[in-house]
Amino acid sequence: MKKLKKILLINWLYFSKEIIEVGDVNFLTGKNGAGKSTVIDALQIVLLGETNARNFNLAANERSQRTLDGYLRADMDENNPYSRRGKDFSTYIVCEFEDDVEHNSFVCGVMFDCRSDGSKHDHFFIYVGKLPENCFVEDGEAMDIHDLRKFLKQNFSRAEVYDTQWEYRRNMLSRWNVHNEQVLRMMKKAVSFRPIVDIQQFI
């Protein structure tokens, strides 16, 4: 069985650097705006292997107004003091999995190379191993794609950085021993749900 153990978020909306520990059963709770959908949307990118904004905020049961750019540049509203707009930076969403059959761990993730001119490039990657202690941060800054490739090559001999999302999805599913992309469509549907607004009706 493959189990999700950790989620690393760097420069993802208002998360500058956060490691989320994951157990067998998890309860994600908090008031509106606490960041529940922000975490789920990040997780979707890695698990679905795509960056389509149509998937964002489905768990909140509201018409999604969120965009990939808004998440990356922390620019969901005006006058946000944490906005990264106009800056060069890197964003990381990385998941560490445990394989209790192979008795090892592996990592699936994506980094976004974001530029001050508004351009961005996504780079999905997979390697056998755990999240590094430095969390892909050197000298206080998240690694750019050049430094990431160098770091992975030096520390994880079988690491792969993929040129296309399709190539990443194919290898990610293979790592899970899944050979049909239909499971990804099922995962999309599973995220959207209707919240409980009347506890008596629920009972």
Model-based region annotation:
Residues 1-141:
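Extreme N-terminal "head/tail" segments of very large remodeling/mechanoenzyme assemblies
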Residues 101-202:
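Extended, charged alpha-helical "arm/stalk" segments used for dimerization and assembly
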